[in-house]
């Protein structure tokens, strides 16, 4: 993590910079680099749901499914109406061969947001 000087250490501004840099790393397909930056942000701001959601996405992209599951679950404890987090948790369960848990969260995502991708994954017809 960047430090502004040896005596002051990380600041809220450097945490914002690290968060934005982590977004860019994830977009550039470097999820492990994103996780490294977000670890410091979350250590300083454990209540930051956006940082946790981004770290969950990075874990998922790095195929670190247990940590992704944990982070998505924490996000959903705080934001139970977050359709994307339900969808992403469902995809995580799907990749772990846990279809019943995946189905539940796919359906919750679709119920919260009628996004065509969520509706297709929910498979309400089955």
Report each predicted region and the residues it spans.
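Long, contiguous interaction/recruitment modules in multidomain scaffold/adaptor proteins
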Residues: 1-17
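Structural signature of tandem alpha-helical TPR/SEL1-like repeats
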Residues: 28-36, 62-74, 96-108
């Amino acid at each position: 993590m960047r430090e502004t000087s040896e005596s002051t250490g990380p600041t809220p501004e450097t945490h914002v910079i690290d968060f934005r840099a982590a977004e860019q790393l994830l977009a550039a397909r470097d999820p492990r680099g994103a996780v490294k930056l977000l670890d410091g942000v979350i250590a300083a701001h454990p209540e930051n749901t956006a940082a946790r959601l981004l770290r969950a996405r990075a874990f998922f992209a790095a195929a670190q499914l247990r940590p992704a599951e944990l982070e998505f679950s924490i996000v959903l404890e705080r934001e139970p109406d977050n359709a994307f987090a339900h969808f992403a948790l469902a995809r995580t369960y799907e990749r772990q061969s846990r279809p019943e848990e995946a189905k539940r969260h796919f359906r919750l995502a679709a119920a919260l947001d009628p996004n065509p991708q969520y509706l297709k994954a929910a498979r309400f017809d089955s």
